């Protein structure tokens, strides 16, 4: 369980990098008013996969250590809720990807930006809670 905890904590910068790629490639297609290309689709898919795995590891960790958190449980639950919404934003992207036009690329970009903003908010919340 400790290994999962370390992996969950250390993956933050990888998540930021993948989110940036998941934003930049669709943004390029949006600015060119084109549908999403293969590279953009793969960037979104990889980010979706990694953030989903990260969320599942976090939920597993929350369930396994439920009684150990004490007063910090509130922050852990807020973090989990924010990350759930971020994962929800990412999983709404295929709905717009299937459109196959520039509007789908734009909406996918908006969802990726919203997801990154929520990930930053959730990570900041849990880091501030750990500091006291």
List each model region and its residues.
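Polytopic transmembrane helical bundles with strong interfacial aromatic enrichment
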Residues: 1-132
């Amino acid at each position: 369980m400790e290994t999962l905890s370390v992996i969950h904590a250390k993956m933050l910068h990888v998540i930021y990098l993948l989110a940036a790629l998941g934003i930049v490639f669709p943004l390029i297609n949006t600015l060119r008013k084109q549908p999403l290309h293969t590279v953009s689709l793969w960037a979104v898919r990889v980010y979706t996969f990694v953030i989903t795995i990260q969320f599942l590891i976090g939920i597993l960790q929350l369930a396994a250590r439920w009684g150990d958190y004490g007063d910090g449980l509130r922050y852990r639950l807020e973090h989990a809720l924010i990350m759930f919404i971020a994962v929800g934003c990412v999983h709404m992207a295929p709905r717009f990807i299937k459109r196959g036009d520039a509007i789908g690329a734009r909406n996918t970009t908006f969802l990726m930006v919203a997801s990154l903003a929520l990930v930053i908010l959730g990570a900041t919340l849990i880091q501030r809670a750990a500091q006291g």
